[in-house]
Amino acid sequence: MTLREITICGLYGYIDKHIKFHHDINLLVGINGSGKTSVLNIIGWMLNPASLPHLCITQFSKISLKITYKSVNYELVCQQTGKRMTYDIVREGAKRKSYHPLGILLLPFPEGFVERPDFKKAALERYSGLKPNENELKTYTFLQQIPKPFILGLDRTVTRESKDPRQNAPMSAVEQIQEIANTNYSR
């Protein structure tokens, strides 16, 4: 599976993002509060039907995630309009829809919902029992089968530990990636 492009409109009521992905490594860089973590979360939520509750409690107007899976291009489109959220899978170039859209009735949230972790937790629990109906089963199953991306968070304050005090210095992003790859994926 390859991520090709993501467009997010109206995230939290004021953030719009459009990112075209490269075929190899992609880095998201920005100041605090610019939406880096939100973009990564949304990508994960869009590709995992078990994470639909997170999309239900996140304010946005439209999310479009373009992917290639098994050599076929798809556009995953999630929209919130009023009291409904719909999630469509569109096979690019198809003359008719291959997948029935997922439809979710959105619950009203109290004022200050975003700032209250207890409200968010309760809302997630209310949506946790979401199950596809008979028409939505093919869509839900497709989403379960899509491989999930590997997201590697890098913190610029990471240091390498060494017995030599001269080597206890901050690591660059490239050094962090090499360290993680060598530690976790070497045989």
Regions found by a protein language model. Name each.
Residues M1-I15:
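N-terminal pre-Walker A segment at the start of P-loop NTPase domains
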Residues L3, F60-K62, P147-P149:
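Extracellular structured ligand-interaction cores
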Residues L11-Y12, W45-L47, P132-N135:
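Short beta->alpha connector loops
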Residues I15, S71-N73, T159:
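Primarily extracytoplasmic ectodomains and periplasmic/lumenal surface modules that are beta-strand-rich
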Residues H22-Y74, Q80-G82, Y87-A94:
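Phosphate-binding glycine-rich loops of NTP-binding sites
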Residues R84-R187:
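Electropositive, glycine-dotted interaction segments
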